[in-house]
């Protein structure tokens, strides 16, 4: 199916995310969609609760995004289509790494990942016909040891910003990754296997 055909097809679901990577991944499997730009509440990047496991944290944040999107959808009286939300976080030494606040924060995160293995958790939540379905992808990623000069150049590229763990595996940082066990698309931000399975379980055909 060509991009032109996809563009002509009516949207089949809402994507409650501004991430261009998630949009590209949905189009990759032929799922036309509308990006739902839900107004973000104060403190959107909610911290992990005390004692909350990383997997539970990322599930909760994806679920919250989906439920908030569904409420906004109804408040705007928009057509009722399935709504998909996702959240990604990086975990090293049991510590959740979200999106870096600034260059110093990005350098700190990248230094923590250098030469080590970490986990990337991406949770997906689907609201459809009054029911919420969810799943989570957990992928182990190993980065080679990185020189300080490499980290500085990477930050100069602007790529670390807006990404959990301060890197994007589909970009320049792909050259940093020596091994991956799990879902490549999950590390990008939307695990396609789990996403397609959720959609099928809700009776939504996936090409």
UniProtKB/Swiss-Prot annotation:
CDD domains: Maf. One of its GO terms (biological process) is nucleotide metabolic process. It is found in: Cytoplasm. The keyword Acyltransferase does not apply. GO terms for molecular function: dTTP diphosphatase activity; UTP diphosphatase activity. Its cofactor is a divalent metal cation. It comes from the Bacteria. HAMAP family: Maf. This is dTTP/UTP pyrophosphatase. It comes from Bordetella parapertussis (strain 12822 / ATCC BAA-587 / NCTC 13253). The lineage of its organism: Bacteria, Pseudomonadati, Pseudomonadota, Betaproteobacteria, Burkholderiales.
